[in-house]
């Protein structure tokens, strides 16, 4: 017999509403068609997506940025301009690989700072920063610049299960993250 632990418990009201962030402009085609959706293919749905009432639309990340240039012969900065011009009521969000930015190697601190400045200046409102190795030092410069630009910062960890990825290790990371 299972026990219902919430039976009789008072309803908890926080006054906060759930906010929904949609990743179709980044992750859907990254997962389904190797990040090959062109900006032209996105345009017909942008205004409808804006009207849904999402809190944010995630439209940029490492693979989308790279694929724009390498496979689609598009300028990812122009993609940002086009999307921002059609998304007027919804925040735009991106996923940033910390010190790797949207690339496949570490970049100098000044490059990280300039990239964040330009992304926010171009219309990105929210930047989710992560490091694939969960090395908080690789998130510090980007996180600092996101805050300086006045954008919304989200720090993320890459979750996995292994002998070194324990609850205690993640708890220590959380303590360190508070200082980033």
Regions found by a protein language model. Give the residues of each.
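N-terminal amphipathic alpha-helix/helix-capping segment at the start of soluble metabolic enzymes
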Residues: 2-33, 85
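Surface-exposed loop/turn and secondary-structure junction residues enriched for glycine/proline
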Residues: 23-24, 35-36, 40, 107, ...
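Hydrophobic beta-strand segments of well-ordered beta-sheets in folded domains
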Residues: 28, 55-57, 92
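A short N-terminal beta->alpha junction/helix N-cap motif
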Residues: 29-40, 71
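Short catalytic helix/loop segments, enriched in acidic residues and glycine
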Residues: 39-48
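Terminal or standalone catalytic/regulatory effector modules within metabolic enzymes
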Residues: 48-68
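Active-site beta->alpha loop and helix N-cap motifs at the rims of alpha/beta catalytic domains
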Residues: 61-174
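Conserved small/polar residues in nucleotide/adenosyl-binding loops
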Residues: 178-180
């Amino acid at each position: 017999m299972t026990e219902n632990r919430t039976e009789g418990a008072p309803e908890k009201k926080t006054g906060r509403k759930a906010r929904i962030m949609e990743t179709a402009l980044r992750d859907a085609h990254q997962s389904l068609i190797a990040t090959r959706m062109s900006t032209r293919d996105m345009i017909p749905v942008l205004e409808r997506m804006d009207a849904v009432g999402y809190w944010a639309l995630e439209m940029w990340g490492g693979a989308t940025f790279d694929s724009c240039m390498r496979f689609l012969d598009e300028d990812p900065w122009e993609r940002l301009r086009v999307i921002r011009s059609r998304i007027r009521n919804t925040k735009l969000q991106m996923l940033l690989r910390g010190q790797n930015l949207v690339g496949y190697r570490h970049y100098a601190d000044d490059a990280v700072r300039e990239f964040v400045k330009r992304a926010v200046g171009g219309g990105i409102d929210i930047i989710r920063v992560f490091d694939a190795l969960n090395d908080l030092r690789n998130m510090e410069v980007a996180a600092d610049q996101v805050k300086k630009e006045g954008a919304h910062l989200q720090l993320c960890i890459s979750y996995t299960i292994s002998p070194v990825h324990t609850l205690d290790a993640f708890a220590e990371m959380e303590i360190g993250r508070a200082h980033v």
